[in-house]
Protein backbone atom coordinates (compact mmCIF):
# COMPACT_ATOMS: atom_id res chain seq x y z
CA UNK A 1 0.00 0.00 0.00
CA UNK A 2 1.24 3.48 -0.89
CA UNK A 3 0.03 6.42 1.18
CA UNK A 4 0.63 10.02 0.19
CA UNK A 5 -0.10 12.69 2.76
CA UNK A 6 -1.42 16.05 1.70
CA UNK A 7 -2.45 18.85 4.04
CA UNK A 8 -6.18 18.59 3.33
CA UNK A 9 -6.57 15.06 1.98
CA UNK A 10 -5.03 11.62 2.10
CA UNK A 11 -4.32 9.51 -0.96
CA UNK A 12 -3.79 5.77 -0.63
CA UNK A 13 -3.12 3.22 -3.35
CA UNK A 14 -4.13 -0.29 -2.38
CA UNK A 15 -3.18 -2.47 -5.30
CA UNK A 16 -5.39 -1.36 -8.19
CA UNK A 17 -7.61 0.81 -5.96
CA UNK A 18 -6.98 4.45 -5.03
CA UNK A 19 -8.74 5.82 -1.93
CA UNK A 20 -9.01 9.61 -1.70
CA UNK A 21 -10.15 11.01 1.66
CA UNK A 22 -11.04 14.66 2.20
CA UNK A 23 -9.41 15.56 5.51
CA UNK A 24 -10.88 18.76 6.97
CA UNK A 25 -13.16 17.31 9.67
CA UNK A 26 -13.02 20.53 11.69
CA UNK A 27 -14.84 22.19 8.75
CA UNK A 28 -17.14 19.24 7.95
CA UNK A 29 -14.71 18.40 5.13
CA UNK A 30 -15.73 21.60 3.33
CA UNK A 31 -13.26 22.75 0.70
CA UNK A 32 -11.40 26.04 0.39
CA UNK A 33 -9.09 26.88 -2.55
CA UNK A 34 -5.98 25.09 -1.21
CA UNK A 35 -8.03 21.91 -0.67
CA UNK A 36 -9.54 22.20 -4.15
CA UNK A 37 -6.11 22.43 -5.75
CA UNK A 38 -4.76 19.52 -3.70
CA UNK A 39 -7.63 17.33 -4.84
CA UNK A 40 -7.02 18.41 -8.43
CA UNK A 41 -3.42 17.20 -8.13
CA UNK A 42 -4.58 13.90 -6.61
CA UNK A 43 -7.11 13.18 -9.36
CA UNK A 44 -4.52 14.14 -11.97
CA UNK A 45 -2.24 11.46 -10.53
CA UNK A 46 -5.12 8.96 -10.43
CA UNK A 47 -5.78 9.50 -14.13
CA UNK A 48 -2.09 9.19 -15.06
CA UNK A 49 -1.18 6.16 -12.95
CA UNK A 50 -1.54 3.11 -15.19
CA UNK A 51 -1.35 0.79 -12.17
CA UNK A 52 -4.53 2.20 -10.57
CA UNK A 53 -7.86 1.20 -12.12
CA UNK A 54 -10.62 2.24 -9.66
CA UNK A 55 -11.00 5.23 -7.33
CA UNK A 56 -12.95 5.69 -4.09
CA UNK A 57 -13.74 9.13 -2.66
CA UNK A 58 -14.78 9.61 0.97
CA UNK A 59 -14.40 12.01 3.88
CA UNK A 60 -12.72 11.84 7.27
CA UNK A 61 -14.92 11.05 10.27
CA UNK A 62 -18.57 10.09 10.60
CA UNK A 63 -20.26 13.48 10.22
CA UNK A 64 -19.56 14.63 6.70
CA UNK A 65 -18.47 13.40 3.30
CA UNK A 66 -18.12 17.08 2.42
CA UNK A 67 -20.24 20.09 3.31
CA UNK A 68 -19.20 21.69 0.03
CA UNK A 69 -17.67 25.14 -0.24
CA UNK A 70 -16.07 26.43 2.97
CA UNK A 71 -18.46 29.32 3.58
CA UNK A 72 -16.55 30.51 6.62
CA UNK A 73 -13.43 30.89 4.49
CA UNK A 74 -15.49 32.70 1.84
CA UNK A 75 -16.97 35.04 4.47
CA UNK A 76 -13.51 35.81 5.82
CA UNK A 77 -11.74 36.27 2.47
CA UNK A 78 -14.48 37.40 0.07
CA UNK A 79 -16.29 35.72 -2.79
CA UNK A 80 -13.39 36.38 -5.18
CA UNK A 81 -11.50 33.73 -3.21
CA UNK A 82 -13.82 30.93 -4.44
CA UNK A 83 -11.16 29.42 -6.68
CA UNK A 84 -10.64 25.98 -8.13
CA UNK A 85 -8.82 24.29 -10.98
CA UNK A 86 -10.34 23.80 -14.42
CA UNK A 87 -11.26 20.29 -13.27
CA UNK A 88 -13.93 21.81 -11.05
CA UNK A 89 -14.92 21.53 -7.40
CA UNK A 90 -12.72 19.05 -5.57
CA UNK A 91 -10.79 18.56 -8.80
CA UNK A 92 -13.63 16.36 -9.98
CA UNK A 93 -16.89 18.01 -11.07
CA UNK A 94 -15.56 19.16 -14.47
CA UNK A 95 -13.36 16.10 -15.00
CA UNK A 96 -15.61 14.73 -17.70
CA UNK A 97 -12.90 12.88 -19.65
CA UNK A 98 -11.78 10.52 -16.87
CA UNK A 99 -12.84 7.04 -17.96
CA UNK A 100 -11.62 5.20 -14.88
CA UNK A 101 -14.55 4.44 -12.55
CA UNK A 102 -14.89 6.36 -9.28
CA UNK A 103 -17.02 5.34 -6.30
CA UNK A 104 -18.29 7.84 -3.71
CA UNK A 105 -18.45 6.44 -0.17
CA UNK A 106 -20.71 9.02 1.48
CA UNK A 107 -20.03 8.90 5.21
CA UNK A 108 -22.31 11.73 6.34
CA UNK A 109 -23.48 15.09 5.02
CA UNK A 110 -22.90 15.56 1.28
CA UNK A 111 -24.12 19.08 0.71
CA UNK A 112 -23.57 21.63 -2.03
CA UNK A 113 -20.23 20.93 -3.66
CA UNK A 114 -19.98 17.77 -1.59
CA UNK A 115 -23.10 16.38 -3.24
CA UNK A 116 -21.83 17.64 -6.59
CA UNK A 117 -18.61 15.65 -6.13
CA UNK A 118 -20.65 12.55 -5.31
CA UNK A 119 -22.85 13.09 -8.37
CA UNK A 120 -19.68 13.31 -10.49
CA UNK A 121 -18.77 9.80 -9.36
CA UNK A 122 -20.07 6.71 -11.14
CA UNK A 123 -21.41 4.83 -8.12
CA UNK A 124 -22.57 6.18 -4.74
CA UNK A 125 -22.59 4.10 -1.56
CA UNK A 126 -24.12 5.97 1.39
CA UNK A 127 -24.02 5.40 5.13
CA UNK A 128 -27.54 5.10 6.51
CA UNK A 129 -27.28 8.42 8.39
CA UNK A 130 -26.08 10.40 5.36
CA UNK A 131 -27.99 13.39 4.05
CA UNK A 132 -27.54 14.84 0.59
CA UNK A 133 -28.64 18.13 -0.90
CA UNK A 134 -27.96 21.31 -2.84
CA UNK A 135 -28.66 24.10 -0.31
CA UNK A 136 -26.69 26.80 -2.17
CA UNK A 137 -29.73 29.09 -2.81
CA UNK A 138 -30.19 29.38 0.96
CA UNK A 139 -26.82 31.16 1.18
CA UNK A 140 -27.09 33.24 -1.98
CA UNK A 141 -25.35 30.81 -4.32
CA UNK A 142 -26.34 28.11 -6.83
CA UNK A 143 -25.18 24.56 -7.42
CA UNK A 144 -22.93 25.67 -10.25
CA UNK A 145 -20.41 22.83 -9.98
CA UNK A 146 -22.70 20.51 -11.89
CA UNK A 147 -25.50 19.94 -9.41
CA UNK A 148 -28.14 21.78 -11.43
CA UNK A 149 -27.17 19.71 -14.47
CA UNK A 150 -26.42 16.28 -13.04
CA UNK A 151 -29.32 15.86 -10.60
CA UNK A 152 -32.03 16.28 -13.31
CA UNK A 153 -30.17 13.67 -15.35
CA UNK A 154 -30.35 11.18 -12.49
CA UNK A 155 -33.92 11.67 -11.23
CA UNK A 156 -37.10 13.08 -12.83
CA UNK A 157 -36.87 16.79 -13.58
CA UNK A 158 -39.75 17.90 -11.35
CA UNK A 159 -38.35 16.03 -8.36
CA UNK A 160 -34.89 17.43 -9.03
CA UNK A 161 -36.32 20.94 -9.26
CA UNK A 162 -38.01 20.43 -5.92
CA UNK A 163 -34.64 19.83 -4.28
CA UNK A 164 -32.76 22.47 -6.29
CA UNK A 165 -35.28 25.28 -5.72
CA UNK A 166 -35.79 24.65 -1.99
CA UNK A 167 -32.36 23.49 -0.87
CA UNK A 168 -34.00 20.53 0.88
CA UNK A 169 -31.92 17.59 2.02
CA UNK A 170 -32.70 14.01 1.07
CA UNK A 171 -31.96 11.16 3.44
CA UNK A 172 -29.82 8.26 2.28
CA UNK A 173 -32.95 6.14 2.09
CA UNK A 174 -34.77 8.73 -0.05
CA UNK A 175 -31.72 9.04 -2.29
CA UNK A 176 -31.67 5.27 -2.75
CA UNK A 177 -35.39 5.16 -3.54
CA UNK A 178 -34.94 7.92 -6.13
CA UNK A 179 -31.99 6.19 -7.76
CA UNK A 180 -29.33 8.71 -6.68
CA UNK A 181 -27.57 6.17 -4.46
CA UNK A 182 -26.69 2.59 -5.39
CA UNK A 183 -26.63 1.13 -1.87
CA UNK A 184 -27.25 2.22 1.73
CA UNK A 185 -25.34 0.50 4.53
CA UNK A 186 -24.49 1.10 8.20
CA UNK A 187 -21.50 3.41 8.60
CA UNK A 188 -19.34 0.58 9.95
CA UNK A 189 -19.81 -1.27 6.66
CA UNK A 190 -19.36 1.70 4.33
CA UNK A 191 -15.74 1.30 3.26
CA UNK A 192 -15.95 -2.49 3.19
CA UNK A 193 -18.93 -2.18 0.86
CA UNK A 194 -17.22 0.41 -1.35
CA UNK A 195 -14.12 -1.76 -1.58
CA UNK A 196 -16.35 -4.72 -2.44
CA UNK A 197 -17.83 -2.78 -5.34
CA UNK A 198 -14.31 -1.83 -6.44
CA UNK A 199 -13.17 -5.46 -6.35
CA UNK A 200 -16.21 -6.47 -8.39
CA UNK A 201 -15.28 -3.86 -10.99
CA UNK A 202 -11.68 -5.13 -10.96
CA UNK A 203 -12.96 -8.58 -11.91
CA UNK A 204 -13.84 -7.02 -15.28
CA UNK A 205 -11.36 -6.00 -17.94
CA UNK A 206 -10.24 -2.43 -17.15
CA UNK A 207 -10.30 -1.30 -20.77
CA UNK A 208 -13.80 -2.72 -21.13
CA UNK A 209 -14.87 -0.72 -18.09
CA UNK A 210 -13.38 2.49 -19.51
CA UNK A 211 -14.92 1.88 -22.92
CA UNK A 212 -18.29 1.28 -21.29
CA UNK A 213 -18.09 4.43 -19.16
CA UNK A 214 -17.06 6.56 -22.13
CA UNK A 215 -19.89 5.19 -24.26
CA UNK A 216 -22.47 5.81 -21.53
CA UNK A 217 -21.32 9.35 -20.78
CA UNK A 218 -20.86 10.44 -24.39
CA UNK A 219 -24.13 8.84 -25.43
CA UNK A 220 -26.19 10.65 -22.79
CA UNK A 221 -28.46 13.21 -24.38
CA UNK A 222 -28.03 11.74 -27.84
CA UNK A 223 -30.89 10.12 -29.73
CA UNK A 224 -30.47 6.34 -29.64
CA UNK A 225 -29.81 6.04 -33.38
CA UNK A 226 -27.05 8.66 -33.10
CA UNK A 227 -25.51 7.13 -29.97
CA UNK A 228 -25.37 3.70 -31.63
CA UNK A 229 -23.26 5.13 -34.46
CA UNK A 230 -20.83 7.14 -32.36
CA UNK A 231 -17.18 6.10 -32.39
CA UNK A 232 -15.40 5.86 -29.05
CA UNK A 233 -11.63 6.01 -28.57
CA UNK A 234 -11.71 3.76 -25.50
CA UNK A 235 -13.71 1.12 -27.37
CA UNK A 236 -11.13 1.10 -30.16
CA UNK A 237 -8.34 0.83 -27.59
CA UNK A 238 -10.19 -2.09 -25.97
CA UNK A 239 -10.63 -3.90 -29.30
CA UNK A 240 -6.89 -3.72 -30.01
CA UNK A 241 -5.82 -4.84 -26.53
CA UNK A 242 -4.34 -8.09 -25.26
CA UNK A 243 -7.24 -8.29 -22.82
CA UNK A 244 -9.72 -9.00 -25.62
CA UNK A 245 -7.69 -12.14 -26.33
CA UNK A 246 -7.17 -13.00 -22.67
CA UNK A 247 -10.87 -12.85 -21.74
CA UNK A 248 -12.18 -15.53 -24.14
CA UNK A 249 -9.06 -17.64 -23.57
CA UNK A 250 -9.51 -17.58 -19.78
CA UNK A 251 -13.18 -18.47 -20.21
CA UNK A 252 -12.31 -21.44 -22.44
CA UNK A 253 -9.61 -22.59 -20.01
CA UNK A 254 -11.96 -22.18 -17.01
CA UNK A 255 -9.65 -19.84 -15.09
CA UNK A 256 -9.68 -16.24 -13.92
CA UNK A 257 -8.41 -13.81 -16.53
CA UNK A 258 -5.16 -11.95 -15.98
CA UNK A 259 -6.03 -8.43 -17.06
CA UNK A 260 -3.22 -6.12 -18.12
CA UNK A 261 -5.06 -3.01 -19.34
CA UNK A 262 -3.15 -3.19 -22.58
Regions found by a protein language model. Give the residues of each.
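Acidic-histidine catalytic/liganding microenvironments
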Residues: 6, 25, 49, 68, ...
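Glycine- (often His-adjacent) and acidic-residue-rich active-site loop
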Residues: 3, 59-97, 110, 138-141, ...
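Crotonase-fold acyl-CoA enzyme core
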Residues: 96-209, 232, 240-241, 245-249, ...
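Terminal peptide-recognition signature
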Residues: 20, 24, 39, 57, ...
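Conserved CoA-thioester-binding segment of acyl-CoA-metabolizing enzymes
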Residues: 1-62, 76
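A short, glycine- and basic residue-enriched loop/turn
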Residues: 25-28, 62-63, 68, 129-131, ...
Amino acid sequence: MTRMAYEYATYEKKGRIAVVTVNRPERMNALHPPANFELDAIWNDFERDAAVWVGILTGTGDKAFSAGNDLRFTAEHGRDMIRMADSGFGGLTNRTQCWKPIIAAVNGYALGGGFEMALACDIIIAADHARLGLPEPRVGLMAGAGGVHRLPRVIPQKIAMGYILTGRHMTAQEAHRLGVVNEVVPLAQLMTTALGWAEEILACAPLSIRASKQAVMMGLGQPLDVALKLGFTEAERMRRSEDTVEGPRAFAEKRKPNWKAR
